[in-house]
Each structure stands twice: as C-alpha cells, then as structure tokens.
Amino acid sequence: MKATAERIEKNTVLLEIEVEQERVDQALNQAYKKVVKQVNVPGFRKGKAPRKMVERFVGTETLFGEAVEIIIPDAYMEALKETATEPIDQPKIDIVQGEAGKALIFKATVEVKPEVTLGEYKGLEVTKASSEVTDEDVEKELARLQDRHAKLVTLEEGEIKKDDITLIDFTGYVDGEAFEGGHAENYSLTVGSGTFIPGFEEQLLGVKLGEEKEVNVTFPEEYHAENLAGKPATFKVKINEIKRKELASLDDEFAKDVSEFDTLDELKSDIRKKLMEVAERTAKSSVENGAVEAAVEKATVEIPQAMISQKVEEMLNSMGQRLAQQGINLDQYFQYTNTSMDDMRQRMRPDAEKNVKNELVLDAIAKVENITATAEETNEEIQKIAEYVKQDAEIVRKTLELQGELGHINQDIARRKVVQFLVENAKVVEGTKED
C-alpha cells in the first residue's frame, strides 16, 4: 500500500491512498463469501452459488462496493499511521480508481490537529498556594461541625432570626390578582438561604410566630416565568412554625458525640491534620495548574471548532454519567433547571476550548521533549483500572485494545508526565494566605 499526505489548508490534510490489486482481489473474495450467504441465487442452495453467478445476480458493482467497504477502513487507518496524520473528525472519502483487476485508489480529506507554536515553557514563574493552616481555620471547621450536629428546636413563641427554618403559608399577587404558582401552604423556608425572590426572606426577619406579614418584592428581569419577569408583587405570608438550631457546647462531650476522640483537643488536632492534607493537595494542584497555564499562555494555536464541539460532547457525557449516579438523566436535569441541551452546550464551550488548548500544548511539549508512556506505566494504569472494575488485567487490556482506548490511556499518562516536567522546570514562588 502507498500513502501520501498533503496539507491543503491550515487544519486540513488530503491523503491519497493506493491499495494494491492483490489486496483488492482478496477483499472481493471476502465480499463474495459475505454476499453469497445473504442472497438466494436461482438453481443453487443458499450460500453455495459460485462467485460468477453471484456477480451476475447482484451486479459486479454491488460486489465491488462491498469489497471497498472492507478495504477502506483498514487502509485509511494504515495511511494515518504511515503519514503520522492525527485526525479530529471523520474523513470525506472520494474513490479515484475503483474497478476489479486494478489497484484501488482513493482520497481521504480530513481535518487534523492544528499545529502548535510553543513559546517558552521552562523557567516560568508559578505561585504556589499557601498550605498554612491557622487556628482560625480549625475553629471555622469546628463551628461547621457544630452546626451540622445542631438540634432543631421548635419555638413556642418568638420572632424569626437568620437561619431559622420556618413553615409558612403564602399567596402572591401581581396587579392585585393572585398568579399561578404563587400559593403554598406549610412551605419550608430557611430564612437567609436566598432560595426565594430577592428581598423576600429579609422582610421575614423579626416577624413573630403566628403573625401575618405583607411582603413587597420585584421579580428579577431574568425570571423564568416571562409573565412575571420585572414586575412588582405583594405576598401575604403567615408564619406557622419556627425552628431554630440549638448548638452543642464545644467540650469533650461534644468530641465524643461527633467523633472517635475522647477530648476536644484530640478532635482539633485531627481537624488540623485533615485541613493540612487538603491544603497540601491544593498547593500541589496550584503549582501544576499554574505551570500548565503559564506554558499555554506563551503558546499560539488556532483551535478548530470541531475539536471544541467534540470536547463539549465529552463533557456532556461525563455530566450524564454523574447525574445517572444520582438517579436522574440529562432530560430530567434540564427540566428541573429550566434549561436545554443547547444552553448547556453553549455554557460548556469556553471551558471546552480551554481544555482542548491545554491538551494540544501538553501534547506539543511531549513531542518536543520526547515524553511518552513507558510499558511499565501503561501496565500500572491497566492494573488500576482492572482493580476498579474487578476484572483480570489481561482481559481489561484486550478490551481497551479492541475499543481503541489504549492510545488514549498512553496519551493521558504522557500528559501527566509533561505536567510534572513543567513543574520541575518552573520557578515556584511561595504564596501567602492572603493570595
């Protein structure tokens, strides 16, 4: 087989591929074996008609078309490898020469990864986030723990304070008329949560249990119900119940109740240790992200829209998988959030473009620095996957090979190695807590 590649536009390559006659003949024979099982040729049992009779029955062009479908996918993949072409989309195939007894010649026009012009990527200054954990950090985390384990007490009397959980009846009016969806009874509202129209919850502060209150608000201009957007409204609200969090005292008894520790000091030490672990991971990530961002900022690349669209679909797929773990699908999510698939695609595009550019720059650096995944690293990654899915590593490897995913795994490993390379070659500046 012969293959040539010519860049005809900035991100478009034209492959010309010639497949030798012998291989075409082999494919024709394969096509015959496939077709003969599918047709009933008069005078012959199904699957037993000779090739010439099958050709007469279905037509030489039909049989040759089947042969072409057998040849092209493999020949195209071989041509990509031979010419080191990296496609980002499906090719447009044009047959130049296609008839029995001759070599098959076809052209494949394909959009490819753009060329990256790297800037300086060594010795760039990167700020490392502070990994300091202060006494104030520990106290804040302790307060959150205290809040999570608070008891809810129903008040017999009193007035609403911030963070109280209330049960309210309300009816909303616009232009003096009650509107659809503006009425509820015994609605649970945490005052100060910001879940209601701006200004609604603030006007409930100080209202006593059992009282009725008239609340005046204006619907936001971007409110989802167009008939209410931007309009002033009045809500008649009755306070049926007030519940308030009762915080436990921060002492040894509290530590025993909420943890495996016997004393408050031991609990604080454990909180500090865990906060430090998080801070150190955050600091490490800040250096890695900073090193990549600095290298990407110095590079120049024009990203094809097809690559951004593909990345958006990957992100949507990941989102769908995460939602499925919570028991809902994308359609339900869009219904709950009053959005659509197109809205989500548009919102995802900026992040998708950033991710694609990062990957392209990392791949370009890997090529220049000859950074690749070793066989040992690939085996380790496959072993991790095997342990996660609880299957034999060799079965996982074969599955990945069949799905064409092994290359992606090696690419991910190489990218991680490039990130470490950038970190090792960066000028790391220690940040402060204020940063």
Curated annotation (Swiss-Prot):
GO terms for cellular component: cytoplasm. Keywords: Cell cycle, Cell division, Chaperone, Cytoplasm, Isomerase, Rotamase. Coiled coil: none annotated. InterPro entries: PPIase_dom_sf (IPR046357), PPIase_FKBP_dom (IPR001179), Trig_fac (IPR005215), Trigger_fac_C (IPR008880), Trigger_fac_C_sf (IPR037041), Trigger_fac_ribosome-bd_bac (IPR008881), Trigger_fac_ribosome-bd_sf (IPR036611), Trigger_fact/SurA_dom_sf (IPR027304). Its EC number is 5.2.1.8. It is an enzyme of class 5 (isomerase). It catalyses: [protein]-peptidylproline (omega=180) = [protein]-peptidylproline (omega=0). It is found in: Cytoplasm. Pfam families: FKBP_C, Trigger_C, Trigger_N. The keyword Cell cycle applies. SUPFAM superfamilies: FKBP-like, Triger factor/SurA peptide-binding domain-like, Trigger factor ribosome-binding domain. Residues 163-248 form the PPIase FKBP-type domain. GO terms for molecular function: peptidyl-prolyl cis-trans isomerase activity; protein folding chaperone; ribosome binding. One of its GO terms (biological process) is 'de novo' cotranslational protein folding. Involved in protein export. Acts as a chaperone by maintaining the newly synthesized protein in an open conformation. Functions as a peptidyl-prolyl cis-trans isomerase. Consists of 3 domains; the N-terminus binds the ribosome, the middle domain has PPIase activity, while the C-terminus has intrinsic chaperone activity on its own. NCBIfam families: tig (TIGR00115). Belongs to the FKBP-type PPIase family. Tig subfamily. This is Trigger factor. It comes from Desulforamulus reducens (strain ATCC BAA-1160 / DSM 100696 / MI-1) (Desulfotomaculum reducens).
